[in-house]
Each structure stands twice: as C-alpha cells, then as structure tokens.
Amino acid sequence: IGLVLPDDSDVFYQNPFFPSVLRGIAQVASENHYAIQIATGKDEKERLNAISQMVYGKRVDGLIFLYAQENDPLVKLVTEEQFPFLILGKSLSPFISLVDNDNIQAGFDATEYFIKKGCSRIAFIGGTKKLYVTQDRLTGYEQALQEHKLSLDSHRTFFADEFLEEKGYKFSKQLFEYDPKTDAVITTDSLLAEGVCNYLNEHQLNVPVLSFDSVNP
C-alpha cells in the first residue's frame, strides 16, 4: 500500500495528527500482511514522479492520499490510470473513494459553541484555502455567524500555507493588533493553536481557543 503525503518537510511530521494516522494504517496493513511504502518529495513534481513509479512499476496494490485539495494532478493521474486509491478528506467527485467527516458542521458547531458562551468577536485561523478541510470549516464558521446575525469580518480570518506554531503566533499578533477585544479563536489545526496559545500566554490574554485534530492531551 502506498501512502501519499502532502509534502516532505518537517511540518508534516511535527503535526501530531498525521503520525497517529500512519500508526493506524500501518497496524491494519500489518494485520493483513501488507507492507507500506511512502511517496514523498519536496515538491509536486517529485511526488508525481514517486507515484508514477509506484503505479507503472506495480510496486503497490493501491494508494492512500493523506490529504485532499483542489485540482490535484496526482489524483488526476491515478484516476486516469484507474488505479485503486482513496482520499483522507473530501472530493467533489462521486466516483472517488474517501474517508472524511462533516467539516462544515464541525466548523458550524465550533463557532456556535462560542456564540452560546456569549462570544461575538470570533476569529478563524486555518490552513491554505486549497485544502477542502479549510474551505469547509470556514464555511461552517461563516454560516454560524450569519445564522446568529453576527457580522463577517475578513480581518478576523487567516490562512496559513503551512501548519506551523509560528504561523499561529504571527496571525494572533495581527489579529489582536486589529481587534484587542477578540473574544474567541478557532483554529483548524493543533499546531496553529499552540502558536495562538503561546501568543496569548505571553501577552496575558484570557481568550478561549478551540482547535481540531489534536491528539495531544
């Protein structure tokens, strides 16, 4: 079984969510007498080359993509070759197998939770908009604000090209310089949340933070 990672940087391995997924896949594969191969590369071209070798060289029986994004040429390749694969995340095609949850509802529920606690200046810090998970959680966030008659403010939404603590810290600085009265922060990733919390602690701000995908206690 081939695993396709979103990138080959340390960022992937820093995120506690992905190693936990890898452990689960490896355990089930081992129980069923399958081996795991990982397709990585520092950029899209290298990953496409790695997948091509797996597919055309018949090195694996199927692929699992550990991410989902728009117009992915890697997914396009395996789709055209009718090679078995599934995506961990969302797809717009009804013909693609996937494992996912309702991220629109998750974003809505997270935002509504804070609204019911009396918060009205809620910020959203997510990953790149190329990722479906970011798009969907943002949609849920916006739907909750609209349903409760709260204004949408683009200055309270931020999007990171990498899931790093530094990004969460940087965006928090920008956020609180813009609106010191921000009363809640939602992040789509635990590493971003750690950066937010670091900023809040340094500046002795008592603002609640809610994150997704955290596997750390």
Task: Locate each region found by the language model.
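Distinct, well-ordered alpha-helical segments
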Residues: 47-55, 201
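Amphipathic helical "hinge" segments at domain boundaries
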Residues: 1-49, 146
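Bacterial carbohydrate/catabolite-sensing allosteric modules
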Residues: 24-33, 79-87, 91-217
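Residues at alpha-helix caps and immediate loop-helix transition turns in enzyme cores, especially N-
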Residues: 14-17, 47, 74, 133-137, ...
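Intrinsically disordered, low-complexity polar regions and short flexible loop motifs
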Residues: 63
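Short beta->alpha connector loops
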Residues: 43-45, 66-71, 191
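Structural motif corresponding to alpha-helix initiation and N-cap regions
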Residues: 47-49, 71-72, 165, 169
